[in-house]
Design a protein with these regions (language model features):
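Glycine-rich NAD(P)-binding loop of Rossmann-like domains
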Residues: 128-161
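Phosphate/diphosphate ligand-binding glycine-rich loop within oxidoreductases
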Residues: 52-129
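Rossmann-like dinucleotide-binding domain for NAD(H)/NADP(H)
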Residues: 99, 230, 236-326
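Oxidoreductase and adenylate-handling cofactor-binding alpha/beta cores
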Residues: 111-127, 168-169, 301-314
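N-terminal glycine-/charge-rich "phosphate-binding" loop or analogous flexible N-terminal tail
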Residues: 1-55
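Short, conserved loop/helix-junction motifs that constitute active-site signature segments
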Residues: 66-73, 90-94, 224-229, 250-255, ...
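Rossmann-like adenosine-cofactor binding region
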Residues: 180-274
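NAD(P)-binding Rossmann-fold cofactor-contacting core
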Residues: 168-185
């Protein structure tokens, strides 16, 4: 099988290499030999490889730059991103090609960022930063998170990892997802349709769900108004999940105590945008769930796990469901 790894044109921090592939293959002894592996960066590299590649591993920027294209032998496409909403509609995907994402790559880093954000909010760090910028000395008293209620929307690898940390700190964890099946780290799980019932008792709201037609604008002005005074918000999902203006209004008015946001609409945030000056808001530049040291090695491990599943006729753990959007 010809497997091609295409690096992004402008982000060498997340490059693949032959050495990285060899290390991943050594961790998958069932892979066997006989594979031709190519690594490219330029458009010419891609054009040469895609003529014979049966599997392609790349990030979303490569898809946007080179698809649709003639890929006569392509069978498997593994995209090294978890959320593929920016690739919709998927009419660029060659017929019969199995599309996968890299969900699972981000879980460790996202979990740590999530619990860090909750601890920052509980200890009023966003407020401290606002006072620091203004040159104000003002004592602010934080509180322990044990016993506080955190509502986590989305219980995939990101939200589930945050739930694990939050439960370990003794928090009361409410999970929210389309299918309200129990989760080992949530005291209870409710369906998305029941979100309004949880918000009035939510001390911290965490958004970790994918962007789909059903979740776009999920946290609108009305739902922000359902949160209790002094609540905090964390968003590591997508900026479009939230009415940003309503969130900024609530922060500036002091109704919400703080927010930690890693995702925005648009990205990057333009100069002069109100997000830069909103009170008690921490801006993280969409890096919360990415660790350059482990990102590609974990992604390759997941790709090989899926390749072995495909080869043996089993379900692919990372197959992307276009209809559901994740």
């Amino acid at each position: 099988m010809h497997i091609h790894l295409q690096n992004p044109a402008d982000d060498p921090l997340f490059d693949f290499s032959h050495e990285m592939w060899d290390a991943a293959a050594a961790r998958a002894p069932d892979l066997g030999g006989g594979h031709e592996v190519s690594v490219g960066r330029t458009g010419a590299d891609f054009d040469t490889a895609i003529a014979t590649a049966e599997a392609l591993v790349c990030d979303a920027s490569v898809i946007k730059a080179h698809f649709p294209c003639h890929a006569p032998r392509l069978l498997l496409l593994f995209v090294t991103n978890a959320g593929l909403d920016r690739l919709a509609p998927f009419d660029w995907l060659p017929p019969g090609v199995i599309l996968m994402n890299n969900r699972g790559t981000h879980s460790v880093k996202a979990g740590e960022f999530g619990i860090m954000s909750l601890l920052m909010l509980a200890n009023r760090v966003p407020e401290m930063v606002t006072h620091q910028r203004a040159g104000n000395w003002r004592k602010l008293w934080g509180a322990a998170v044990a016993g506080e209620t955190v509502t986590i929307v989305g219980l995939g690898s990101l939200g589930g990892s945050i739930a694990r940390h939050a439960s370990g700190f003794g928090m009361d964890v409410i999970g929210v997802r389309a299918n309200p099946a129990p989760h080992p780290h949530c005291g209870r799980v409710i369906g998305t349709g029941a979100l309004d019932t949880a918000l009035p008792d939510t001390r911290f709201l965490v958004l970790a769900c994918p962007l789909t037609p059903a979740t776009r604008g999920l946290i609108d002005r009305r739902r922000i108004g359902l949160l209790p005074e002094g609540a905090g918000v964390v968003n590591i999902g997508r900026g479009e999940l939230v009415d940003q203006n309503a969130l900024c209004d609530s922060l500036d008015a002091g109704k919400l105590r703080g927010a930690v946001l890693d995702v925005f609409d648009p990205e990057p945030i333009p100069p002069g945008h109100r997000l830069w000056t909103t009170k008690n808001l921490i801006v993280s530049p969409h890096t919360a769930a990415d660790d350059p040291a482990t990102y590609n090695p974990i992604s390759l491990d997941l790709f090989l796990e899926n390749l072995l599943a495909w080869r043996s006729g089993r379900a692919l753990p990372n197959q992307f469901d276009i209809a559901r959007g994740y």
